[in-house]
Regions:
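Histidine/acidic-residue-rich, glycine-tolerant segments that coordinate divalent metal ions
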Residues: 1-3, 9-143
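Alpha-helical scaffold elements within enzyme catalytic domains, especially in hydrolases
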Residues: 8, 173-174
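A conserved active-site cap/scaffold subdomain adjacent to cofactor or substrate pockets
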Residues: 139-164
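Short amphipathic alpha-helices in soluble, non-transmembrane regions
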Residues: 162-172
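Short, intrinsically disordered, charge-balanced linker/junction segments flanking boundaries
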Residues: 175-179
Protein backbone atom coordinates (compact mmCIF):
# COMPACT_ATOMS: atom_id res chain seq x y z
CA UNK A 1 0.00 0.00 0.00
CA UNK A 2 2.85 2.35 0.81
CA UNK A 3 4.45 1.77 -2.60
CA UNK A 4 1.10 2.35 -4.28
CA UNK A 5 0.69 5.64 -2.40
CA UNK A 6 4.22 6.67 -3.40
CA UNK A 7 3.51 5.94 -7.06
CA UNK A 8 0.27 7.95 -7.03
CA UNK A 9 1.89 10.90 -5.23
CA UNK A 10 4.81 10.94 -7.67
CA UNK A 11 2.33 11.01 -10.54
CA UNK A 12 0.65 14.13 -9.16
CA UNK A 13 3.75 15.94 -7.89
CA UNK A 14 2.94 19.17 -9.74
CA UNK A 15 -0.37 19.45 -7.85
CA UNK A 16 1.11 20.11 -4.40
CA UNK A 17 3.91 22.11 -2.82
CA UNK A 18 6.36 20.86 -0.26
CA UNK A 19 7.76 17.47 0.56
CA UNK A 20 6.08 14.14 1.18
CA UNK A 21 7.74 11.72 3.57
CA UNK A 22 6.49 8.14 3.69
CA UNK A 23 7.11 6.45 7.04
CA UNK A 24 6.56 2.78 7.81
CA UNK A 25 5.88 2.23 11.51
CA UNK A 26 6.88 -1.23 12.65
CA UNK A 27 5.62 -2.98 15.80
CA UNK A 28 2.54 -0.79 16.20
CA UNK A 29 0.78 -3.41 18.34
CA UNK A 30 3.59 -4.01 20.82
CA UNK A 31 5.00 -1.83 23.56
CA UNK A 32 6.64 0.59 23.27
CA UNK A 33 5.81 0.30 19.56
CA UNK A 34 7.74 1.49 16.57
CA UNK A 35 6.60 5.13 16.73
CA UNK A 36 8.71 5.94 19.77
CA UNK A 37 11.85 4.55 18.15
CA UNK A 38 11.16 6.38 14.89
CA UNK A 39 10.67 9.72 16.65
CA UNK A 40 13.81 9.21 18.74
CA UNK A 41 15.78 8.50 15.56
CA UNK A 42 14.57 11.80 14.06
CA UNK A 43 12.24 10.56 11.35
CA UNK A 44 10.05 13.66 11.80
CA UNK A 45 12.98 15.99 11.03
CA UNK A 46 15.13 16.73 7.95
CA UNK A 47 12.77 17.68 6.45
CA UNK A 48 10.43 18.63 9.29
CA UNK A 49 6.99 16.98 9.16
CA UNK A 50 4.08 19.45 9.33
CA UNK A 51 1.24 16.94 9.07
CA UNK A 52 0.97 13.19 9.30
CA UNK A 53 -1.61 10.77 8.00
CA UNK A 54 -1.83 7.16 9.10
CA UNK A 55 -2.87 4.11 7.17
CA UNK A 56 -3.59 0.62 8.41
CA UNK A 57 -4.70 -2.50 6.62
CA UNK A 58 -8.05 -3.76 7.93
CA UNK A 59 -8.97 -6.68 5.67
CA UNK A 60 -12.45 -7.15 7.15
CA UNK A 61 -13.46 -3.47 6.89
CA UNK A 62 -13.59 -3.13 3.09
CA UNK A 63 -13.67 -5.23 -0.04
CA UNK A 64 -10.60 -5.44 -2.25
CA UNK A 65 -10.05 -2.17 -4.09
CA UNK A 66 -11.88 -0.04 -1.51
CA UNK A 67 -10.36 2.49 0.85
CA UNK A 68 -12.00 3.94 3.96
CA UNK A 69 -11.32 7.40 5.38
CA UNK A 70 -11.88 8.77 8.87
CA UNK A 71 -11.01 12.12 10.46
CA UNK A 72 -9.52 11.84 13.94
CA UNK A 73 -8.34 8.80 15.86
CA UNK A 74 -9.35 5.52 14.29
CA UNK A 75 -7.32 3.07 16.33
CA UNK A 76 -7.03 2.60 20.06
CA UNK A 77 -4.26 2.47 22.59
CA UNK A 78 -2.66 -0.92 23.16
CA UNK A 79 -1.80 -1.93 26.72
CA UNK A 80 -0.35 -5.41 27.09
CA UNK A 81 -0.50 -7.21 30.42
CA UNK A 82 1.15 -10.32 31.83
CA UNK A 83 0.51 -11.91 35.21
CA UNK A 84 2.32 -14.66 37.05
CA UNK A 85 0.21 -16.10 39.84
CA UNK A 86 2.43 -17.98 42.26
CA UNK A 87 1.12 -20.41 44.82
CA UNK A 88 2.12 -23.62 46.51
CA UNK A 89 1.52 -26.66 44.36
CA UNK A 90 0.67 -30.13 45.48
CA UNK A 91 -1.41 -33.20 44.80
CA UNK A 92 -5.01 -32.61 43.77
CA UNK A 93 -6.22 -35.03 46.46
CA UNK A 94 -4.91 -32.67 49.16
CA UNK A 95 -5.92 -29.15 48.07
CA UNK A 96 -5.90 -27.99 51.69
CA UNK A 97 -2.09 -28.23 51.59
CA UNK A 98 -1.78 -25.98 48.55
CA UNK A 99 -2.23 -22.37 47.64
CA UNK A 100 -3.99 -22.90 44.31
CA UNK A 101 -2.78 -20.48 41.60
CA UNK A 102 -5.22 -21.97 39.05
CA UNK A 103 -8.22 -20.95 41.13
CA UNK A 104 -6.72 -17.52 41.88
CA UNK A 105 -5.92 -16.92 38.19
CA UNK A 106 -9.42 -18.04 37.17
CA UNK A 107 -11.00 -15.64 39.67
CA UNK A 108 -8.78 -12.81 38.44
CA UNK A 109 -9.67 -13.49 34.82
CA UNK A 110 -13.43 -13.59 35.46
CA UNK A 111 -13.32 -10.38 37.48
CA UNK A 112 -11.09 -8.61 34.94
CA UNK A 113 -13.49 -9.54 32.15
CA UNK A 114 -16.18 -7.60 34.04
CA UNK A 115 -14.19 -4.34 34.10
CA UNK A 116 -15.42 -3.11 30.73
CA UNK A 117 -19.04 -4.08 31.45
CA UNK A 118 -19.20 -2.62 34.96
CA UNK A 119 -16.52 0.05 35.34
CA UNK A 120 -16.28 1.72 31.91
CA UNK A 121 -18.93 4.20 30.79
CA UNK A 122 -21.02 2.48 28.09
CA UNK A 123 -20.59 5.58 25.91
CA UNK A 124 -16.83 4.93 25.86
CA UNK A 125 -15.06 2.16 23.98
CA UNK A 126 -12.85 -0.40 25.64
CA UNK A 127 -11.77 -3.98 25.02
CA UNK A 128 -10.21 -6.44 27.44
CA UNK A 129 -8.90 -9.56 25.70
CA UNK A 130 -7.15 -12.51 27.30
CA UNK A 131 -4.77 -14.11 24.82
CA UNK A 132 -2.87 -16.74 26.78
CA UNK A 133 -3.03 -18.82 29.94
CA UNK A 134 -0.56 -21.50 30.99
CA UNK A 135 -0.26 -23.57 34.13
CA UNK A 136 0.40 -27.13 35.12
CA UNK A 137 1.02 -30.29 33.15
CA UNK A 138 -0.99 -32.97 34.94
CA UNK A 139 -4.74 -33.07 35.65
CA UNK A 140 -4.25 -34.40 39.19
CA UNK A 141 -1.56 -31.93 40.32
CA UNK A 142 -2.13 -28.36 41.42
CA UNK A 143 0.75 -26.38 39.89
CA UNK A 144 2.87 -23.86 41.75
CA UNK A 145 2.41 -21.20 39.06
CA UNK A 146 -0.02 -19.95 36.41
CA UNK A 147 0.78 -17.32 33.81
CA UNK A 148 -1.73 -15.40 31.75
CA UNK A 149 -1.70 -12.33 29.58
CA UNK A 150 -3.60 -10.24 27.12
CA UNK A 151 -4.32 -6.76 25.91
CA UNK A 152 -6.60 -3.86 26.72
CA UNK A 153 -7.58 -1.18 24.23
CA UNK A 154 -9.27 2.18 24.65
CA UNK A 155 -9.55 5.56 22.95
CA UNK A 156 -9.23 7.76 26.04
CA UNK A 157 -6.62 8.11 28.76
CA UNK A 158 -9.37 8.19 31.39
CA UNK A 159 -10.64 4.77 30.32
CA UNK A 160 -7.07 3.41 30.25
CA UNK A 161 -6.65 4.65 33.84
CA UNK A 162 -9.91 3.04 34.99
CA UNK A 163 -8.88 -0.29 33.50
CA UNK A 164 -5.38 -0.14 34.99
CA UNK A 165 -6.70 0.79 38.45
CA UNK A 166 -9.30 -1.97 38.37
CA UNK A 167 -6.80 -4.61 37.20
CA UNK A 168 -4.48 -3.68 40.07
CA UNK A 169 -7.31 -3.70 42.62
CA UNK A 170 -8.50 -7.12 41.46
CA UNK A 171 -4.98 -8.57 41.56
CA UNK A 172 -4.39 -7.25 45.09
CA UNK A 173 -7.80 -8.43 46.29
CA UNK A 174 -7.42 -11.96 44.93
CA UNK A 175 -3.88 -12.13 46.30
CA UNK A 176 -5.12 -11.16 49.76
CA UNK A 177 -8.04 -13.60 49.61
CA UNK A 178 -5.96 -16.51 48.29
CA UNK A 179 -3.25 -16.43 50.90
Amino acid sequence: MMLGAAKILCGMRERFAGCVKLIFQHSEDTLPGGAKELVEKGVLENPHVDAIYGMHVLPDAHRAGQVGFHIGPITTSVDLFDFTVSGRGGHGSQPQNTTDPVLAAAQMIVMMQQIVARRVDPMEMAVFSLGSIHGGDAPNVIPAEVKFGGVTRAYSESVRSVIKEQVQAIAKGIEAASG
